[in-house]
Amino acid sequence: MRRMRNVKIVATLGPASSDYATIRALFEAGADVFRLNMSHGTHDDIAARHKIIRQVEADLDRPIGILADLQGPKLRVGTFANDAEELVEGAAFRVDLSAAPGDATRVQLPHPEIFAALEPGASLLVNDGKIRLRVEDCGKDYANCSVTVGGTISNRKGVNVPDVVLPLAALSEKDRADLEFACELGVDWLALSFVQRPEDVIEARSLAKGRAAILAKIEKPAAVKAYDAILTVSDGIMVARGDLGVELPVHSVPPIQKRLVRGARAAAKPVIVATQMLESMIESPVPTRAEVSDVATAIYEGADAVMLSAESAAGKYPIEAVRTMDNVALSVEKDPTYRSVIDASRVIRRETIADGIVAAAREIAEATNIKAIACFSQSGNTVNLVARERPHVPIIALTPLMSTARRTALIWGAHCVITEPQERFKGAVISAVRAARDHGFAGEEDQIVLTAGVPFNVKGTTNILRVAPCDERLISRVDPE
């Protein structure tokens, strides 16, 4: 099954999408990667969904990526004696470590590390910013606040602290257990929530031990400030606009999104734009015009993937949501201005031989009637480099490793094909042209560009570029064996 678009679609699974028929229908509607949210569901639930995805993959003979999204250190208030209280603007309100049920004057905040980092003037945002508190004075186990934006506060509502880099590890004990479980299960990507510093990613990578690629979620102001350092140690990025829009002014999120996407593209690392993309489709079969424009904007920016959360996990119309996203992507990529927008934001990087080879491959493809760029890759790195160029022709990612094929399902423009391990260059050329023909990218009369590394099966050796005819009879006998 060949996609007719470059941008990928990530669909979150949940109660509305947990059976074989629905998951298969989501894939056939356009989902390329499935997200398993570790914040919801038991390990048994997650394992059951993982098993179904792999069954769909086997039945349709197409590599499918799986992304496990770790919960992260979510901060929450305690409980109230009456379950909820109304906070009035200007009133005093205290948060502290006492486990006593809350009332209209105080509630537990069971996170001593927060109090250690707070200073007068800091803000506490409750329930996605619907309630705002200003810290007036604080100590090691309390903070006396004034209510700047009132509202109803109830049990276990989330708390954000936008003004402070909190001394919290990005991985809670639950996250560590979930990470190990997900890696043992065989997921392809791990999304790390509430990253604040590069050390958070390094810690997760040390625990994953190469079993899954690490995707850093940018959803804290501290992560935006440390973005370049975080990007360097990550395999990919998710622009998680939900908490980002709570802790920062909402009008600042679009330019931040644009900067994060461009930075990831320049680094040749996949980037997902996520959160509330088609939010109204949780209840409605048709999205708003603004939501469609939001998805389109991310595609024009050159994001590798756009993501559905509750729309596909718990909404009434999960398949329609994926189909809508697919249709928007197809429409954008057919727009005559799309190419000029993508090309204008391309970052030229010529630091290595591999950089030069993939840039030359794109230029050759655009200057001639080349039908596709095929690249052999053990790790997926060459596929990332080719995708960074955002070529005008499809990318055929050839690898003998199913794990690499699944990870590249997230990469812009990449069509993953499992091949036999190659030892000789001529065999690689023949394998590439057969893949191009068999998957509908080219006919016998056409040509493709091939990139590879010799010796084969060695990471980071991209050093050959070949223009190859798709008619095997025309492949030169003087090609190196």
Predicted regions and their residues:
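Non-catalytic helical/linker scaffolds that mediate oligomerization, partner binding
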Residues: M1-E481
